[in-house]
Amino acid sequence: GVAEEIAQFTVDETQLGNYDGKFLKIQRKTRATLMDIIDDKSVGIIEELPERNIVKIAKPMGVIGALCPSTNPEATPVIKAISAVKGRNAIIIAPHPRAKLTNKMICDYMRDAIVAMGAPADLVQSIDVPSLDKTNELMRQCDRILATGGEAMVGAAYSSGTPALGVGVGNAVITVDDTANLDEAAEKI
């Protein structure tokens, strides 16, 4: 299947990790992300508190610039794309050069799936020939950055002038907002 193809291709291209680990990330992390948010409201009125005259409204941010590492190219682009598209945002993925072919393969699969669901393919785009200049330009032009990678890359995202969320080596960004079940979130974190 597709997951097996991507797992093997990732290991072959990057020479990082192993097939079983990559396959499990695809199966577990990407599906878990989708299942965690599939029923959540992500645009429009997401909550009403009539007793306080409060209506919470979520809206798209625009174009998300996603910086992805060579160490997890099989799952990171998918997870970022799920989150972006769920919020009716477009996403442009800037892969590490060592994982550019894996990224292209995954983006092509995602674009096909998006079209099959009746949405425009260009909601998900990738930089097929990545370079530092192109990534820097993406960070200047996009509306929000989601950066996953080494300290220098995440630091560049934070100092780009564009609002950014970054995940460095061994860390994970977890946003717990006021719509979260705090007991459940604490247990999972």
Regions found by a protein language model. Name each.
Residues 93, 125-128, 146-149, 164-167:
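General beta-strand structural signal in soluble alpha/beta enzymes
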Residues 77, 106-108, 127-132, 180-189:
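Active-site glycine-rich loop that binds ribose-phosphate moieties when present
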Residues 79, 86-87, 154-189:
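ALDH superfamily catalytic-core signature
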Residues 38-112, 117, 160-162, 171:
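Conserved small-residue-rich beta-alpha loop and adjacent elements
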Residues 1-54:
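N-terminal Rossmann-like NAD(P)+-binding subdomain of aldehyde/semialdehyde dehydrogenases
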Residues 43-56, 124-142:
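A structured beta-alpha segment of the ubiquitous adenosine-cofactor-binding alpha/beta core
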